[in-house]
Structure formats: structure tokens, C-alpha cells
Curated annotation (Swiss-Prot):
InterPro entries, A to Z: EF-G-like_DII, EFG_III/V, G_TR_CS, P-loop_NTPase, PrfC, RF3_C, RF3_dom_3_sf, RF3_GTP-bd
Keywords, in A-Z order: Cytoplasm, GTP-binding, Nucleotide-binding, Protein biosynthesis
Domain tr-type G, residue spans: 9-278
Organism field: Xanthomonas oryzae pv. oryzae (strain KACC10331 / KXO85)
NCBIfam families: prfC, PRK00741.1, small_GTP
GO CC terms of this entry: cytosol
Molecular function, one GO term: GTP binding
Family: Belongs to the TRAFAC class translation factor GTPase superfamily. Classic translation factor GTPase family. PrfC subfamily.
Role: Increases the formation of ribosomal termination complexes and stimulates activities of RF-1 and RF-2. It binds guanine nucleotides and has strong preference for UGA stop codons. It may interact directly with the ribosome. The stimulation of RF-1 and RF-2 is significantly reduced by GTP and GDP, but not by GMP.
Protein name: Peptide chain release factor 3
């Protein structure tokens, strides 16, 4: 095996997905703790404490206690290199989450034991389904009272349409929580106060028949557990690696992230069974991770990771070959050669200069406005990775300045924030308005906060008569020009220079579509080959 194949085989690149407040950020902290990446996991609840959760690094996130931008964290574990991409838990940031899911090889779904499958989980699951992403499930907050575990498995299977294969099973919950039993190894991991539940600091019995176990959990509970396990193993599916890798089955674990309990069995199983980097589709051909030439795509752009410097970093997922510091690459969209000199690796907001990176790794490239989401970098081959979408926003606001002299800063700020995908930004053809589009109201708060904090611009967002937007395409240039003339009042340009129809009502959109049968109206736009505008 070549170096590239060896290194690719060691990588495990995944994202954690969940409904807000299911405990995703806490679990992220605990995984990093096991990887030795952080010494002291920051509790998510004590917001006023100086120590904030490692993965929530933007000032606004620290204030509100929600993950708004996705971070990238890398840590070694058991001879493997784990790349963990944290995703925004808040409902308004679905688009950013979707794009992160294009950059991973598998996902970990976190479910609150008391709430079960929630709306956001369903949406994220649909996204994973589009790509057949393999998913493991961690049912969290076992130290609190919650739903019956058998009912939870049934809920996941029915609502999310994926087969469940329980790998660990709870022994009681809430006040009665005694531990979990590992259904594959047979081990029993006890839950005891004051332990940190690493293998070195846990009481583990080799099986349910081990002497001394009955004393620890009580004869009655042991009998109930045996009956329950008989029922569970009869009614559920055994773990099937092929079904999991095809996205048809999810191995299920139970635990309590905040207490570190049940996390290590999950991490050990993940390391053993989650897929390494996979072959990926491009416009020309499929690219295998073992190829010796570098290729990668940008799935996210983050402005101002370092408040001391107005910087922008493009996050690139390496898909094949080896990245070395200072190497020359082809920026496919512009056709220019770009030297990747000071690329970064990440531990949330702690960054280090990357000396090398392999398939599955994520590196940060300093971006001075020339790189867009969806851009591909190669060692010379002209190909582009596909499937990184922009969604039509559902909410729109007009930006108005309190200080009209700050127009230039406002335009720059909006262009940069839309480039990183925090919002979408449209300029109507027939007016000087600056219109923002978002998936949820919180996004406008975030943009207003960041404009003020990072660009010194105080902007107000007012309602505007736009209900929805569609990207407009037509192969016939003459027909497109005609359409443009007739509908100029409803047309605008997005931040990538694409023509967009800004519909005041759904009825108006329907009429426009009926009157222009040759014009295609799209609710999503691929980031591939997006053209940047000043």
C-alpha cells in the first residue's frame, strides 16, 4: 500500500448531528477528551463561566450558548486520526450543516432520551439519506428519566425509516441508572458517581453471569434485565456492517454525555467500523482517495476566526493525494495556479500551520475573496466535485444603515458573510436595495451582530416584499434576455453573480413560470463553478 492509501485508511471523518439541546456540543467535548485533545471539557450550561465549550468559539455563540458555525477538530485515537466536524445545532443553520455533511464519510446522531426523534433530527436525516451517509446513534441523557428504550428504537425505525441495531443497552435510567450492557462483547459497564468512565476508571464485568454483578445492581434488576434483553435481541436486528455502511442500519448506543458515561464504547466501535474516506463524484470522473495527486473541495468559508485580523478561511476537505505546505495547486474555477502556503489545521479555534494533510483531513486556506464554497483545488486536472448546494432562502429582509457613510463597509460585510454561507445576499436589478435571504430569523440576528462586531456597521433589517427566490436559467440567450426585460422589477443578482427571481408572492412565481416555459426556475443552486463578483 502507498503512503496515501495507508494514511487515508487511518482517517475517520464525521459530523455530529442533532436537534438543538440534545447534548451534541457536550458529547463533542467528551470525544475530544478521550482523544487527549483537550484536558478539561467545558460544561455547556455554565455560560457565565470563563471556560466555554471548545467547539463554540464565536463571541455570539458564547453569549447565547448555541453552536452557530461548524468547527473542525482533529484528534488521534487508537492509531487512527479522527476528524470531527461540529455542526450548528440551531434550526436556522441548516444550510451550513448540509454543506458540512457533504464533507464527511459518516455521521453520529444524538437523540435526547426524554424527547426522542425531533423535527430537526428528521430534516438532517433526510440530508444524510440523500447521500447514503452511514449513521451511528447515541441516545443521550440517560442519567435523566426518559422514554422506554424499546419505544425509542421503534420511534427511530418508524420516523426516520432506518433499521436499528442496539450495541449497548441501558440498565435502568434516571435515578435507577446502573450501567449499560454491551450486546456484542457481553461486557457490563457500571454507572458509578464520581468516575470519568475511561476504561481505566470504570467497573466493567465481563458478562451478566460474572460473580459480584448481582450484588452491584441487585438480583431483581438483573432478572428484569435478562428478560428485557431476550425481548430486545429477539425483536431487533444484529449489527450488519454492510447495512450500516450503506446507510440502511444505525448501530445504537446509550449513555450520558455530561457524565462521560457510555462514550468510550461508542468511540471504540466507531473507530473500528466507521468508513475511511470514500471515492467521490466529480464533473468528469470518480476520484479515489488512494490517488497520488491532490484534490479537494471547499465546503465552508468562515470570516474573522481571528478577531485581531480581518481574515477569512476556506475549509477544504482533502479527497485524494497528499497536501504539503507551500505546494502549487490549480484553483479550477478561475484556472489560476495558487500556492497553498500557510494552510491551517484546526482544534476548534486553535489553529496550527499544516505541514501535511491526507484524504479525509480538513485544512484551512487563507482566502482574500477569491475562493467560493464549492471550489475545487487539484494538482492540475480540471475537474470539480459535485453536490454542494445553495438553498433558496425562506425569509428576506432589506438592510438599512443607521450611518449612510458606511455603505462600502456594509457591502463588503454582506458579501463576505454571504460568501461563507451565513446568509444570502441579493442586489435587485432596478434598485439600490441590499436584500438578505435566510433560512430562519436567528440568521439575521447573527448577521447584524457580526456586521457590528467585525465590520463596525450598525444595520437594521426591515421587512421587504419578497416571499421566495428562484435561480433562473435558460439555454436560449434571446429568450433569457426577453424574460429579463419583462421581469426586471423582480430580478436580482446573488453574491456569485447568478440571476435570481425574487417573487413577491407564490402566485406571482407561479404566473412567471407559466409565462416563461423555456426558463428554468431552481430552488437550489450548485456551488460548482460559481463566478465571484466584486
Amino acid at each position: 500500500m502507498s503512503d496515501v492509501s495507508n494514511e487515508a485508511a487511518r482517517r475517520r471523518t464525521f459530523a455530529i448531528i442533532s436537534h438543538p439541546d440534545a447534548g451534541k456540543t457536550t458529547l463533542t467535548e467528551k470525544l475530544l477528551l478521550f482523544g487527549g485533545a483537550i484536558q478539561m471539557a467545558g460544561s455547556v450550561k455554565g455560560r457565565k463561566a470563563a471556560r466555554h465549550a471548545t467547539s463554540d468559539w464565536m463571541a455570539l455563540e458564547k453569549e447565547r450558548g448555541i453552536s452557530v458555525t461548524s468547527s473542525v477538530m482533529q484528534f488521534p485515537y487508537e492509531g487512527k486520526i479522527v476528524n470531527l466536524l461540529d455542526t450548528p445545532g440551531h434550526a436556522d443553520f441548516g444550510e451550513d450543516t448540509y454543506r458540512v455533511l457533504t464533507a464527511v464519510d459518516s455521521a453520529l446522531m444524538v437523540i435526547d432520551v426524554a424527547k426522542g426523534v425531533e423535527e430537526r433530527t428528521i430534516k438532517l436525516m433526510e440530508v444524510c439519506r440523500l447521500r447514503d451517509t452511514p449513521i451511528m446513534t447515541f441516545i443521550n441523557k440517560l442519567d435523566r428519566e426518559g422514554k422506554n428504550p424499546i419505544d425509542l428504537l421503534d420511534e427511530v425505525e418508524t420516523v426516520l425509516g432506518i433499521q436499528c441495531a442496539p450495541v449497548t443497552w441501558p440498565i435502568g435510567m434516571g435515578q435507577r441508572l446502573k450501567g449499560v450492557v454491551h450486546l456484542i462483547s457481553g461486557e457490563v459497564h457500571l454507572y458509578e458517581q464520581g468516575r470519568n468512565f475511561t476504561r481505566q476508571d470504570s467497573t466493567i464485568f465481563p458478562s451478566l453471569d460474572a460473580p459480584g454483578l448481582a450484588e452491584k445492581i441487585g438480583e431483581q434488576m438483573l432478572t428484569e434485565l435478562r428478560d428485557e434483553l431476550e425481548l430486545v435481541q429477539g425483536a431487533s436486528n444484529p449489527f450488519d456492517l454492510d447495512a450500516y455502511r450503506a446507510g440502511q442500519q444505525t448501530p445504537v448506543f446509550f449513555g450520558s454525555g455530561v457524565n462521560n458515561f457510555g462514550v468510550q464504547p461508542l468511540l471504540d466501535f466507531f473507530i473500528e467500523h466507521a468508513p475511511p474516506p470514500q471515492t467521490r463524484e466529480t464533473t468528469g470522473r470518480r476520484v479515489a482517495p488512494s490517488e497520488t495527486k491532490l484534490s479537494g473541495f471547499v465546503f465552508k468559508i468562515q470570516a474573522n476566526m481571528d478577531p485581531q485580523h480581518r481574515d477569512r478561511v476556506a475549509f477544504m476537505r482533502v479527497c485524494s493525494g497528499k497536501f504539503t505546505a507551500g505546494m502549487k495547486t490549480l484553483h479550477v474555477r478561475s484556472g489560476k495556479d495558487v500556492k497553498l502556503a500557510n494552510a491551517l489545521t484546526f482544534m476548534a479555534s486553535d489553529r496550527e500551520i499544516a505541514a501535511e494533510a491526507w484524504p479525509g483531513d480538513v485544512i484551512g486556506i487563507h482566502n482574500h475573496g477569491t475562493i467560493s464554497i464549492g471550489d475545487t483545488f487539484t494538482e492540475g486536472e480540471s475537474l470539480s466535485f459535485t453536490g454542494i448546494p445553495n438553498f433558496a432562502p425562506e425569509l428576506f429582509r432589506r438592510a438599512r444603515l443607521r450611518d449612510p457613510l458606511k455603505l462600502k463597509q456594509l457591502q463588503k460585510g454582506l458579501a463576505q458573510l454571504s460568501e461563507e454561507g451565513a446568509t444570502q445576499f441579493f442586489r435587485p436589478l432596478m434598485s439600490n436595495d441590499l436584500i438578505l435571504g435566510a433560512v430562519g430569523v436567528l440568521q439575521f440576528d447573527v448577521v447584524a451582530y457580526r456586521l457590528k462586531d467585525e465590520y463596525g456597521v450598525d444595520a437594521i433589517f426591515e421587512p421587504v416584499s419578497v416571499t421566495t427566490a428562484r435561480w433562473v436559467h435558460c439555454d436560449n440567450v434571446k429568450k433569457l434576455d426577453e424574460f429579463r426585460e419583462k421581469n426586471a422589477g423582480n430580478l436580482g443578482i446573488d453574491a456569485a453573480g447568478q440571476l435570481v427571481y425574487l417573487a413577491p408572492t407564490r402566485v406571482n412565481l407561479q404566473l412567471a413560470q407559466e409565462r416563461a416555459p423555456d426558463v428554468r426556475f431552481s430552488a437550489t443552486r450548485e456551488h460548482v463553478h460559481a463566478k465571484a463578483i466584486d
